[in-house]
């Protein structure tokens, strides 16, 4: 994970330059992947709130003999389901996953099918996915999944609230804090947060680490080559506690489901949130709201290179699936990532896409803005829950939440994380 993490992070820069600058006409002839004969049903595990049904319907219309049995999970449920299934030795035929340390255990244990160069060519993966996006999904130099989306995460603000109070988008960290102070004085929650499960709070914590430690040290922390018990990280955790004390988050956020955070903006109770482009298709447009009222900004970490948090999302395949089920699952991923299929479904399926030449649809200003950033203005760093080994993610979450609750000081929390890092590294010697 450690050298892989750094390589993945470096590959993001290349992906940012290429992903939306390559036109669909540059794609080579589509591959002709094998189609199972007879009636075949394969299982697919995916996030319930993601628009998989759009592609399932298109796929099943194109291949009437093939059926997708979609089992729906929440974000945290699918993580648990994969852990349980891998321990039992019985996975789905295909499943949605993230990358980094969230996918590595299944790759290392032999559950995830390696997509060899031959398989990549057979299913058009090498032609239809931007090459650098494939690098993002690789683990130890090998590919174990087909990238579907790339997801930057950053600060969004509600324009109508900012306009009401004469506020402008903050471009520096100091400006951000002044905006928070003003909003708080007006009775508006500055930043909506759903702290249950810890990963939404992590987005803010990661932002603070990026600000105080800088990109180079942040990457070294992920690689376990720098100490979490350092002045820079302590400052980040101190800032987290300060924001809690000042009431910059909604009261009781530590127990709020992340899904309940965005409604605080929709109800004009909060003005900002750390989120990703998926809210455009999954929340804002379905609510018949104007997506132009929810504006993503580059989270002002005051660092060079300019970075925000982000990750890729992929489909993986079970090595022990029956041959026809495995072929059907691979064909499903190949179908979804065919440029013409991806482009005609982009409005409903969501963006930014990892497919060559696929542009965000009209009427999607959030995706369009992020696509523009990723052409070179903004680079990405992995979120902690993908960058660190999963054994250490829990230690990070526990320390972070303890600071929020006031049961640990920032100094003690950082020392606790580093103690876990040292113990983990000792087991790898």
For every predicted segment, state its role:
Residues 36-48, 66-71, 93-94, 144, ...:
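Short, well-ordered beta-strand elements
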Residues 61-62, 88, 165, 246, ...:
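Extracytoplasmic/periplasmic substrate-recognition and gating elements
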Residues 85, 92-93, 123-161, 189-192, ...:
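A structural signal for short loop-to-beta-strand junctions that line the ligand-binding cleft
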